[in-house]
Amino acid sequence: QRRIDFQFGWFLDPIYFGDYPESMRERLGSDLPTFSEKEKEFIRNKIDFIGLNHYTSRLIAHRQNPEDVYFYQVQQVERIEKWNSGEKIGERAASEWLFIVPWGLHKLLNYIAKKYDNPAIYITENGMDEEDDQSATLEQVLNDTTRVGYFKGYLASVAQAIKDGVDVRGYFAWSFLDNFEWAMG
């Protein structure tokens, strides 16, 4: 819960509830700004929809003194790849941080709906990367079964969330065109 408070609550709790999550206040104290009543009123419920970029989910464990970057040290959490039992969260894509976890999106959509009064949600980016294999033939590149499986799984999770009553209004796939913005602005 602490990790999701820092990931989503940091932005959404002030809009919906007028303040940061308690777990953030406990760890960051006066480093977090406070909102006046006028500011709270100005931002409260002033949201038309949530745009959600989602690529992966991670396993998180409590660590008193995590070795990871400062952001995780403050949260006292650490990202882990597998439980002690050896169970992994999902298959890894090309990036070390990206695992294929369709059920994670389903769980997140239901969490957002429950905590934030079922706002309209547009999944503004969802997808995976793959290794850049210059030796692959066109036939091999077009036989992209991992990506097909990724989208089938994630779209099925979105469909299930909609059946659960989550107000998902749109879904956009992460494509090669999205990455032009990094180099070509």
Positions of the model-derived regions?
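Active-site region of glycoside hydrolase catalytic domains
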Residues: 1-185
